[in-house]
Amino acid sequence: MLGVNGQGKSNCLEAIGYISALRSFRTQLTKPLFQKNTNEFQLFYEIEHERLGLTQVELQIKEKHKVLLIDGDPVKRLADFIGLFPVVPLHSGDLMILRGSPSERRRFFDMTLASVDPDYFEALRMYHRTIQERNHLLKMRSKDLAFDAFEKELAKFAFSLVTKRKEGIGQISQILANVYKAFSEDNESPLLAYKPDTDLASVHDYEQFFAEQRKKDLIMGSTSRGPHRDDYVISLAIGGAKEYGSDGQQRGLSVALRMAQASLFELKLKI
């Protein structure tokens, strides 16, 4: 794709990539994607799909509302859409997966796992919704009884997320090691490890945990512990890649992560 600066090459790539997860690879926000003085945009795709054949997709995007159509039929659940049209972007911002905060790594691996497992996407969505509801109760300093129902649901989704993350990261770690060795000159295998903030044996254990955290969380006004605080660590022989990896190693690993993501999509989604 050739063109002068400011002609819209990146915008075109951004529009292509948007279909994957209904978000841009450069920002989590929707508002910066609108043309000046507008509050919505539409995207139309015609795709030769491996399983669906020739497919037309229409996206109508507003700041707080999205309409998705596949061959003219509305998509009722986002979980049914994520993963249908996977796109793997490769861009300079990928270095933040290595160098950035835990939220950068959670975002990358959440989207990777959600794209190949609708149940993961649904557990993630419901976990964050329930966290918001519990946080509202904490700010309102509600009675203990009001928390019980929310914490029961929160425990169920927390246990599901941690279980699925363990399984998924185990698969990605093996793929990552093979991919990195294939193009790296240092001939070592990186290790991807999942570091859960809470690693408990059952849903009941999570219920007890959130109940025990309630007093502390009331003081803070938010839910301080749980899978939304998880992290992932990539290590080389010298130690953690974030702390000890050279600039070249970090760049190589960021590329390898995207290649591993593509390989996982190919394996799980049969594309």
Region locations from a protein language model:
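Short, flexible helix-adjacent loops and helix caps
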Residues: 24, 139-143, 267
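Alpha-helix boundary/capping detector
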Residues: 38-45, 134-139, 160, 206, ...
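An accessory alpha-helical subdomain
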Residues: 96-184
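Nucleotide-state sensing region of NTPase/ATPase domains
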Residues: 17-104, 110-116, 120, 170-181, ...
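Conserved NTPase motor "head" modules and their coupling/switch loops across ABC/AAA+ ATPases, GTPases
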Residues: 1-4, 18, 145-271
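Conserved lysine of the Walker
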Residues: 9
